[in-house]
UniProtKB/Swiss-Prot annotation:
CDD domains assigned to the protein according to its UniProt record, in alphabetical order: ABC_MetN_methionine_transporter
UniProt-annotated binding residues for ATP: 67-74
Ranges where the ABC transporter domain occurs: 29-270
Family label: Belongs to the ABC transporter superfamily. Methionine importer (TC 3.A.1.24) family.
Name of the protein in its database record: Methionine import ATP-binding protein MetN 1
Top EC class, one word: translocase
Chief subcellular location: membrane
Name of the gene encoding the protein in the UniProt record: metN1
Function according to Swiss-Prot or TrEMBL: Part of the ABC transporter complex MetNIQ involved in methionine import. Responsible for energy coupling to the transport system.
């Protein structure tokens, strides 16, 4: 039996390629106007799990799909790996329309799609080596080839010394490393991750995310992961898609989505990890109208190189106002600096307008949140 080659997508038998094979060589995953409806059952009404979803994941990139529970994330990943079929639309992976394959061809095509699960899904009766070897055994790979394939994978995920350990003897992070190695056993070109870090502690989560980034760099894998944690998106994704109620409400480059979230759902996700939201103590004091002796409260979002500029001191000097910093932080997102400051100032309306105009220079975004006494 022919084995798939690293990063080489499965192809139908030689001859003229059928219509369902995409001619886009740079696209790893293409989701085209997909709709998934679960029909009504007895007293339950029909459920529209996905509604007109379209996404493109370039080969070798990492896309994070984030949404709340019930948003449609798990349904989406089941359609990509062919465990379920859409009611309409197309799913194309590695140039092959998954939704048009027979069961036999689908089983073959799945070898180019690796899957990492939330709860590891390891067989307790098998060692780390045995769990990683399982998909190769199912594919009929010769024993000698299995040995040559599995040992480097265990070494890649940092478990070369744990090959004979059973799942009960491994930590949560080690179990997930075994799961990642198993997902890579058939040398896929696409890796799907279903909440792979949600059952892990923060330190272990960081280690697993770094491992996934290393795998993406070293093997040039296309990675699509679903999560409900924006911190995971910030750490791992090149691009992000926000799903809500079965629809993509926002998508784009990770930095752009963090820097300028357009949808309310996205803004809530972003504020949970960037500190861009006002702290609770300030929200309790904010007033919509200026009280006697009150100060205006501004939120300034700095993007890219502007995050490193001494803008506050310059505005304070030019306009003769004192800007009091109430909260703020600067961090790196997708390799770019991103900062948020919340300040208060006592200024007449005309001076306040000038302050906002100067602070809005370049890529900065300035919002007036209200007033505090």
């Amino acid at each position: 039996m022919n084995e798939p080659i690293m990063n080489a997508p499965w192809q139908p038998p030689a001859g003229e390629l059928p219509a369902f094979v995409s001619s886009q060589p740079t696209i790893g995953i293409l989701i085209d106007r997909v709709r998934k409806v679960y029909p009504a059952r007895k007293s339950s009404a029909e459920v529209v799990a996905l509604d007109d979803i379209s996404l493109t994941v370039p080969k070798g990139s990492i896309l994070g799909v984030i949404g709340r529970s019930g948003a449609g994330k798990s349904t989406l990943i089941r359609l990509i790996n062919g465990l379920d079929k859409p009611s309409s639309g197309r799913v194309i992976v590695n140039g092959v329309e998954i939704t048009a394959l027979s069961e036999r061809d689908l089983r073959t095509a799945r070898r180019s799609i690796g899957m990492v699960f939330q709860h590891f899904n390891l067989l307790s009766s098998r060692t780390a080596f045995g769990n990683v070897a399982l998909p190769l055994e199912i594919a009929g790979t010769p024993k000698a080839e299995i040995e040559k394939r599995v040992l480097p994978l265990l070494d890649m995920v940092g478990l070369a010394d744990k090959r004979d350990r059973y799942p009960a003897e491994l930590s949560g992070g080690q179990k997930q490393r075994v799961g990642i190695a198993r997902a890579l056993a058939t040398e896929p070109s696409v890796l799907l991750s279903d909440e792979a870090t949600s059952a892990l502690d923060p330190e272990t989560t960081d280690q697993i995310l770094e491992l996934l980034k290393q795998i993406n760099r070293d093997l040039h894998l296309t990675i699509l992961f679903i999560t409900h944690e924006m911190a995971v998106v910030k750490a791992l994704a090149d691009r992000v898609a926000v799903i809500e109620g079965g629809r993509i409400v926002e998508d784009g480059a990770t930095f752009d989505v963090f820097a300028t979230p357009r949808h309310e759902v996205t803004r809530r996700f972003v504020s949970s990890v960037t500190g861009s939201g006002a702290p609770d103590w300030l929200l309790e004091k904010l007033q919509p109208q200026q009280p006697p002796g009150g100060q205006a409260v501004l939120r300034i979002t700095f993007k890219g190189s502007d995050a490193n500029q001494p803008l506050l001191s310059r505005v304070s000097r030019d306009l003769g106002v004192n800007l009091n910093i109430l909260s703020g932080q600067v961090e790196m997102i997708a390799g770019h600096p991103f900062g948020t400051l919340i300040v208060s100032l006592d200024a007449a309306p005309e001076v306040l307008r000038q302050v906002i105009a100067q602070l809005s220079a370049g890529n900065n975004l300035v919002e007036q949140l209200g007033y505090v006494a």
